[in-house]
């Protein structure tokens, strides 16, 4: 599962110490990327230079309401800083107003300055109607981006229903990133079973450390070696001792 995870830290109060820990964990668990705010791209690149983990950053985040020129500048700046992947928020209001050409043009302008690097387009599904989600997916198809991404994490996150709807209308080459509210291994598995190829989460380590507590009477999950809430203890790795 690790190769599907974008380990994410986009909080306003993230510190150098926080980003360093994020990158150390990413190297240990071999995540696909770390996703950080633009300010921390150079630091993340330095910390991950001897690893396979890529550095992702955000554009127009989290509202998507910056002008096209600002988003393009953000993209150029992030490319120069060394970012490998880019998660861009569309202009949600413009989409809802039916300004389809504006939304398409903005995506294309950003894509054109990325030197062929991975572009994920965040459509913020929780703020859209079913018809608007369909239109957003069609725009992603037509602009040949790499991923459509469900959420910023600042509103309601991904849902199974949203992913099924996206799958119905996306092209064969458009990949799907689910994000927002994915906190457990079970959460992640639900989306991966639907064909999602990237999971955005700030709980990446917890997700990989989750295990099925086979010997626990309640059949629930707990962290290996720790006591479950039912009072029993996880024995999952006893056979490895």
For the regions a protein language model found, what residue spans apply to each?
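Structural motif
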Residues: 29, 81, 113-114, 139, ...
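Histidine-centered metal-binding segments
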Residues: 211-241
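Alpha-helix-loop-beta-strand connector modules within alpha/beta enzyme cores
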Residues: 38, 42-63, 98-125, 142-143, ...
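Catalytic cores of alpha/beta
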Residues: 45, 66-77, 128-139, 161-172, ...
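Glycine-rich, proline-tolerant flexible connector loops at the mouths of alpha/beta enzymes
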Residues: 23, 27-43, 61-66, 86-104, ...
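Generic N-terminal amphipathic, Lys/Arg-enriched alpha-helix
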Residues: 1-14, 20-27
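Glycine-rich phosphate-binding active-site loops on the catalytic face of alpha/beta enzymes
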Residues: 57-62, 80-95, 142-159, 178-218, ...
């Amino acid at each position: 599962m690790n190769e599907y995870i974008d380990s994410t830290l986009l909080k306003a109060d993230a510190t150098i110490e926080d980003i360093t820990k994020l990158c150390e964990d990413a190297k240990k668990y071999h995540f696909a990327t770390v996703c950080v705010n633009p300010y921390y791209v150079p630091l993340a690149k330095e910390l991950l230079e001897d690893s396979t983990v890529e550095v992702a950053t955000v554009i127009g985040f989290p509202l998507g309401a910056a002008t096209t020129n600002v988003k393009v500048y953000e993209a150029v700046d992030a490319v120069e800083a060394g970012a490998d992947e880019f998660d861009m928020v569309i202009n949600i209001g413009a989409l809802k107003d039916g300004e389809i050409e504006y939304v398409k043009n903005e995506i294309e302008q950003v894509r054109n300055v990325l030197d062929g690097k991975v572009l994920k387009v965040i459509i913020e599904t929780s703020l859209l109607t079913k018809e608007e989600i369909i239109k957003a997916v069609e725009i992603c198809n037509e602009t040949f981006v790499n991923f459509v991404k469900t959420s910023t994490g600042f509103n309601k996150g991904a849902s199974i229903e949203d992913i099924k709807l996206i799958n119905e209308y996306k092209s064969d080459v458009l990949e799907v990133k689910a994000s927002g509210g994915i906190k457990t291994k079970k959460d992640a598995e639900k989306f991966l079973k639907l064909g999602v190829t990237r999971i955005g989460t700030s709980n990446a380590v917890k997700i990989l450390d989750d295990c099925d507590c086979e010997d626990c009477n309640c059949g629930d999950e707990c962290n290996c070696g720790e006591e479950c809430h039912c009072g029993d203890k996880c024995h999952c790795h006893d056979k490895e001792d």
